[in-house]
Regions:
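C-terminal regulatory/interaction regions
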Residues: 1-7, 28-30, 320, 328-382, ...
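Transmembrane alpha-helices and immediately adjacent membrane-cytoplasm interface residues
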Residues: 37-62, 376-377
């Protein structure tokens, strides 16, 4: 009973929205009445439901001037003062409990894209919404925690030790083991297994529980460590496995209500339920659960890590135990045998059904879920047009239904980040795009073709188009307009792409100016449902008469957040607003995806906006 109630409480926390929680509560009460016929359970769950509403309700936290360093990550620090947290990016060498004064606080913003990790959203779930890079040290801590960290950081094997003890991720360690805290947990069970041969197990568990709390105090209370401590406490309080799991869920949800979907909590929970309820082929079910979770959370799975998961978990436990004294540790990065896949809703729903059914009774036919990623890739009937959010640069990807063809327009680079390495290639891998049929480089500017040399080394590019007289070889109308034109500069020589699919027409302008727009008006009778606005929304493009003649419904703008050029210009935005053209800008909403199937077309943005395009 308590396990069912705790799972209901967990569902309320996941839903977050108060109205959704109330609706779920009504349906769940009906289920509880049917299952238990006990009004006291009703009352208990109503209390849990109300508690979840309180826990998920947004709280206004006032930013402070001074903070103490409570977390250290690779490339940044987390400062805390009362209930306020801030992300600190600085070259200063800070340690735990150092006190700092901060200035120039601003909201956290990253260039978010579909299927890729969102640093902004990750921090929002930890109630961290602001950042600064202007820091002054007020007081250097001399606490034991600080001195211990500085000592370990100075060791030759510090990268692996810091990853296992502090969760400061290093490329030499597979990320899943640090996120799930398997270094500490495996070490715990190794010690428990050795000591219980001579002493009472309950007493040993109590001692190790105290040690775990002390470890968190002197190192860091990661999500995985907190969950593990709660579970170990539950084993001392309850003899029933379901009650132990229920206690862990309830306590963790109350402490971290916004992080109940973290892999650090979800993965151990699902594996615990498999361990308790699944009676047949438990090893296979565990591997299938890990496979699904890796795809859902990381969009990839290393097959070596998957099949030898238990062996590597124990290995990390041994390294965790002897990390203090071993000076040179081997590189633990596993050989790369990785499958990339970004699950859609179909896979997630099937995974949930598979999991529930396997808890009841495993059947070999459930393994059909393994082929879903491969079928889903080549069975997508939608025409897809993606505008990636790569800062002050351009990159769009056009995918024909069933992966029949892939066209990329531009692959711009960034002075402060390798867009190809960090965004374009991970996106292509997650979409299982292994070749580009046609790459159109609109013109010779770094923010449009700067990534070409890097891209061609990482993926097959069958054809590159840099001239308007070339043809795009696809099975739908695709034209490069105005091959003969009068151009004064590189921007005006931009290739202009015009294509049609499912009765929806697209016009991609590159960096062409108003002069070129006027030449288009006199040369063609153009209509376009969607326009990729010229020159990142600069006022050198987007002539009002030109836009009006197109009869556009949607305008796409690719530009960097708070870029130094002021793109998109107020003038351009005003023109688009006056003409009642719906405008989507990557700096505001992240990457943009447009889908069409026959006469049904819609747009989705990375920040969750959805809209239907009527033609």
């Amino acid at each position: 009973m308590m396990l069912i109630l705790s799972l209901g409480f967990l569902a309320c926390l996941i839903l977050k929205e108060i109205l959704c929680i109330l609706c779920f509560t009504l349906f769940f009460l009906v289920y509880l009445d049917y299952r238990f016929k006990d009004k006291r359970i009703w009352i208990l769950f109503i209390l849990f439901s109300l508690l979840s509403c309180i826990l998920v309700y947004p709280k206004e936290v006032q930013q402070q001037d001074t903070y103490k360093i409570t977390e250290i990550k690779k490339g940044y620090y987390i400062g805390k003062n009362r209930g306020s947290k801030i992300l600190i990016q600085t070259d200063l060498d800070l340690s735990f409990q150092d006190e700092v004064k901060v200035k120039n606080i601003e909201p956290i913003h990253t260039d978010d894209n579909f299927t890729l990790f969102s640093f902004t959203r990750y921090n929002e779930n930890k109630n961290i919404r602001f950042r600064t890079n202007s820091v002054e040290i007020i007081h250097k801590s001399t606490s034991f925690k600080s001195r211990l960290y500085n000592y370990l950081k100075s060791k030759p094997n510090s990268s692996i030790v810091l990853s296992l003890y502090y969760g400061i991720h290093d490329e030499s360690i597979d990320e899943i083991y640090t996120m799930l805290g398997y270094g500490y947990m495996s070490a715990y069970y190794i010690v428990l297994h050795v000591l219980k041969r001579k002493w009472d197990e309950t007493r040993i568990r109590r001692i190790l529980l105290v040690f775990s709390v002390l470890f968190g105090h002197f190192f860091v209370f990661t999500l995985s460590l907190t969950r593990f401590i709660l579970y170990q406490l539950s084993t001392l309080l309850f003899t029933s496995k379901p009650n132990q799991i229920a206690f862990t869920i309830l306590c963790f949800g109350m402490i971290y209500p916004n992080q109940v979907l973290s892999i650090s909590f979800v993965c151990p929970l699902l594996l615990q339920l498999v361990s308790y309820f699944c009676t047949e082929h438990k090893w296979i079910v565990q591997k299938m659960v890990l496979l699904g979770l890796m795809f859902i959370y990381f969009k990839k799975v290393n097959l070596i890590s998957l099949f030898f998961f238990n062996i590597f978990r124990k290995l990390y436990g041994l390294i965790f135990l002897f990390g203090f004294i071993v000076q040179d540790l081997i590189n633990l990065k596993l050989p790369d045998l990785t499958i990339h896949y970004a699950p859609r809703i179909l896979f997630i729903v099937l995974f949930i059904i598979f999991y529930i059914q396997c808890l009841k009774h495993f059947q070999w036919k459930y393994l059909w879920i393994c082929i879903v990623p491969f079928l889903e890739i080549y069975c997508n009937p939608f025409f897809q047009v993606y505008t990636l959010n790569i800062g002050q640069a351009d990159c769009s990807i056009i995918v024909e239904p069933f992966h029949k063809s892939v066209v990329m327009i531009d692959c711009g680079q960034n002075l402060y980040r390798d867009n190809v390495e960090r965004i374009i290639m991970p996106f292509l891998e997650n979409k299982n795009i292994h070749a580009i049929d046609t790459l159109i480089l609109t013109h010779d500017d770094f923010d449009h073709n700067g990534g070409y040399d890097s891209l061609k080394e990482k993926i097959e590019i069958k054809e590159v188009i840099e001239d308007s007289n070339q043809s795009v070889h696809v099975d739908y109308p695709f034209y490069l307009l105005l091959s003969e034109r009068e151009s004064k500069d590189t921007n005006d020589s931009s290739l202009i792409s015009y294509f049609t699919y499912d009765h929806l027409t697209y016009l991609f302008m590159g960096d062409a100016s108003k002069q070129i727009e006027k030449q288009l008006m006199t040369t063609y009778d153009l209509k376009a449902d969607v326009i990729k606005v010229g020159h990142h929304g600069s006022n050198t493009s987007s002539d009002p008469d030109f836009l009006d003649s197109l009869d556009c419904k949607v305008a796409l703008i690719s530009c960097g957040y708070k870029n130094k050029y002021g793109h998109p210009s107020v003038e351009t935005l005003k023109t688009l607003e006056t003409l009642h053209i719906n405008t989507l800008c990557t700096s505001d909403c992240g990457s943009i995806a447009m889908y069409s199937l026959f006469h049904f077309s819609f747009v989705v943005t990375n920040d969750g906006m959805f809209g239907i395009i009527w033609t």
